Regions:
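Active-site helix of classical SDR
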Residues: 112, 148
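Residue(s) in the substrate-gating loop at a strand-loop-helix junction
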Residues: 132
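Conserved glycine-rich cofactor-binding loop
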Residues: 13-14
Length: 268
């Protein structure tokens, strides 16, 4: 086990993080999965659970150090933990936006800052940040979530330029809708403005429908494992809708992309 690749995956209680942790374990890696509460987390075969709140500086430092103490190193960090938020931009309170960015963006800053000294000392490592197709596409009525994922994209690309001198690479995985509870149970902006009611409902129903018909997390988990262990590429979009959307964004004119996106959110 001492020669196995040591992988840390944040947010393994359910969904994509749990599926990714399982796949790393099956690949023979030594896997540490972080959860907010071990007492409330279901056991995960082949995965060592670590209690860590990615929104708390001290918790992240303690959690990462405990893994290093046990495994003596961290080869791969997968930043998967995240949350969603729906509602019009005008409806979203700054406190709600701050909480979202704390979880989706600043958590990556915390974990990266905790692992990078050790990776720099070893002159190797890989950081995989789970973004979204909404990191390169707009999303009506998911504006703040989309903004947080755009931030993840910029942070990751900049980080990669900074750390490659140390033999470390950062990379992105950009899934589309996946059949998890993240979007089905997404919190809504607490302040509702009646003028947005009709379109907000249409967009919300479209998202729920897309999630219910979306693939299970296994495909995204495969992309994460390849991003971590395979040849470095800046971004990976899982096969299917995510890959198609990436190609549309790159190769289609802006007008048709805009019209297609509005249609997919039920806005005509």
């Amino acid at each position: 086990m001492s020669n196995s690749t040591v992988v840390v995956v944040t947010g393994v209680s359910s969904g994509i993080g749990r599926a990714a942790a399982e796949k790393f374990a099956k690949r023979g890696c030594r896997v540490f999965g972080t959860v907010r509460s071990i007492a409330k987390a279901a056991p995960l075969p082949g995965v060592e659970l670590v209690e860590m709140d990615v929104r708390d500086d001290a918790s992240v430092k303690t959690g990462i150090q405990s893994i290093i103490d046990r495994a003596k190193r961290i080869d791969v960090l997968v930043n998967n933990a995240g949350m969603s938020l729906t509602g019009a931009v005008e409806e979203t309170a700054t406190a709600e936006a701050a909480s979202l960015f704390d979880t989706n963006v600043l958590s990556i800053l915390r974990t990266a800052q905790a692992v990078l000294p050790h990776m720099r000392a070893r002159r190797s490592g890989r950081i995989v940040n789970v973004s979204s197709v909404l990191g390169f596409l707009p999303a009506p009525y998911m504006g703040l979530y989309s903004a947080s994922k755009h931030a993840v994209e910029g942070l990751t690309e900049s980080l990669d330029h900074e750390v490659r001198q140390f033999g470390i690479r950062a990379t992105l995985v950009e899934p589309s809708f996946t059949r998890t509870n993240l979007d089905i149970n997404a919190p809504q902006a607490s302040s509702k403005i009646a003028d947005y009611d009709r379109e907000r409902a249409l967009a919300s129903n479209a998202v729920v429908g897309s999630v219910k018909s979306a693939p299970e997390p296994g495909g995204v988990a495969n992309a994460i494992v390849e991003a971590a262990l395979g040849t470095w590429r800046m971004r990976r979009t899982p096969a299917g809708q995510a890959s198609l959307l990436s190609k549309l964004r790159r190769f289609m004119p802006a007008g048709p992309v805009d019209a297609s996106l509005r249609k997919s959110f039920g806005l005509g």
